[in-house]
From Swiss-Prot:
Keyword annotations from UniProtKB, A to Z: Chaperone
PANTHER family, per the entry: 60 KDA HEAT SHOCK PROTEIN, MITOCHONDRIAL
Similarity annotation: Belongs to the chaperonin (HSP60) family.
Name of the molecule in the record: Probable chaperonin-like protein PrmG
Biological role stated in the UniProt entry: Probably plays an essential role in the productive folding of PrmA and PrmC, and thus in the formation of the active PrmABCD complex.
A Pfam family recorded for this sequence: Cpn60_TCP1
GO biological process: protein refolding
UniProt cross-references to Gene3D superfamilies, sorted A to Z: GroEL, GroEL-like equatorial domain, TCP-1-like chaperonin intermediate domain
Span list, region Disordered: 153-191
Entry GO MF terms: ATP binding; ATP-dependent protein folding chaperone
Source species, domain of life: Bacteria
Keyword Chaperone: yes
This protein's record includes keyword Chaperone: yes
Length: 391
């Protein structure tokens, strides 16, 4: 395919047009007086939103050079959303200002590389200042102020989230769920999170959010690498007899075993998700044991004397709901015995008191947080699909 080339001032001008086109559409949503945008959909009703990254995703320009500029700013918004989860409009406005002033300096004869180095030094200074000004959240009132943003959020819906008992504000979370009613309801459940996601995108159940959600699954816990059909088949048969989906937490799943599980998802014969077990090295078996206590199952390992071919229902853990993204797994409503969970937490706290190495202390604190974490599940409803998405 032949390429169209543009140089110097003309190229910079067309790139800047794309940057401004996207940024001007996004920045109207900035701040407490930010306005909404209406986005046309090829199918279904239009979307009303004041979320910067949602608006940015929809923008494609006819001019290929201007579109390159728009895509550069879109990448800024999407990266900010992925790392922070908010602040996309602010990032877009800052990117527009940096492009505008940088191009102005170049037009006046400044060396582009010196301009870039100056921007990088300024970024370092700004980050240092922001870190000094940062305020740690201190309790439920701080959480309410954060949750009430944007201003369209109602005080009623914010207060519908129950306070997570015996849990610090930093370890609690409130994931929204779609409801069949028009109001908002909530309940509190135990939750555990770790930073491993699904190993195959074919296991996704919600392509729009790129996440896999399993309701009331059984959970296979093992520190082994599963490759053959014979190794995974007993767990599949147990799950199918119980008519429940299967979550596999293992060192790895590959080969025919993975193909069998992926095929079951694609043909809707057996819903399953495979996640690499949390932890690394000698810590992996310890973290799997934490999960086995929380979920009420057993770890399939050489040390426990249980083989994959011997798996039965009593060896599998159970949970209310599992949400798996590309990089994170959230387990809500584990069904383990509370007495055993409390005993495990006391055991970990005793280890924490004896630990002297910072890395060991950090790992133990994380394991305790997973065992004691709670989540408030908010079910959000609306009269129309547009109202539901806005809430």
């Amino acid at each position: 395919m032949a390429k169209e080339l543009r140089y110097n001032a003309e190229a910079r001008l067309r790139l800047e047009r794309g940057v401004n086109a996207l940024a001007d559409a996004v920045k109207v949503t900035l701040g407490p007086k930010g306005r909404n945008a209406v986005l046309e959909k090829l199918t279904g009703p239009p979307t009303i939103t004041n979320d910067g990254v949602t608006i940015a995703r929809e923008i494609q320009l006819r001019d290929p050079f201007a579109n390159m500029g728009a895509q550069l700013v879109k990448e800024v918004a999407m990266k900010t959303n992925g790392v922070v989860g908010d602040g996309t409009t602010t990032a877009t406005v800052l990117a527009q200002a940096m492009v505008r002033e940088g191009l102005r300096a170049v037009e006046q004869g400044a060396n582009p590389m010196r301009v870039r180095r100056g921007i990088e030094r300024a970024v370092t200074a700004v980050l240092g200042s922001l870190t000094e000004q940062a305020v740690q959240i201190g309790g439920r009132s701080d959480l309410e102020r954060i949750a009430r943003w944007p201003p369209a959020t109602t005080r009623w819906s914010v207060r519908s989230s129950p306070p997570p008992s015996n849990t610090s504000a930093r370890t609690a979370s409130s994931p929204p769920r779609r409801a069949t009613h028009s109001g908002c309801r909530s309940r509190s459940s135990t939750a555990s999170e770790f930073d491993h996601g699904y190993i195959s995108g074919y296991m996704v159940t919600n392509p729009e959010r790129m996440e896999a959600v399993l309701d009331n699954p059984v959970v296979l816990l093992t520190n082994k690498k599963i490759t053959s059909v014979q190794e995974i088949m007993p767990a599949i048969e147990v799950a199918k007899r119980a008519d429940r989906p299967l979550l596999v937490l293992a060192e790895d799943v590959d080969g025919p075993a993975l193909q069998l599980l992926v095929g079951g998802n694609m043909h809707n014969t057996m819903r399953s998700v495979v996640v690499r077990a949390p932890g690394f090295g000698h810590r992996r078996i310890a973290e799997l044991e934490d999960l086995s206590v929380a979920l009420g199952g057993h770890v399939i390992a050489k040390d426990t004397g249980i083989e994959l071919s011997e798996v039965s229902m009593e060896h599998l853990g159970t949970v209310m709901r599992v949400t798996v993204t590309e990089n994170e797994t959230t387990i809500v409503g584990a069904h383990g015995e509370q007495e055993l969970v409390d005993a495990r937490v006391r055991h970990l706290e005793a280890q924490l008191e004896r630990a002297r190495i910072d890395a060991d202390r950090d790992a133990l604190e994380l394991r305790i947080a997973r065992m004691t974490g709670r989540v408030a599940v908010i079910r959000v409803g609306g009269v129309t699909s547009v109202e539901l998405k806005e809430r």
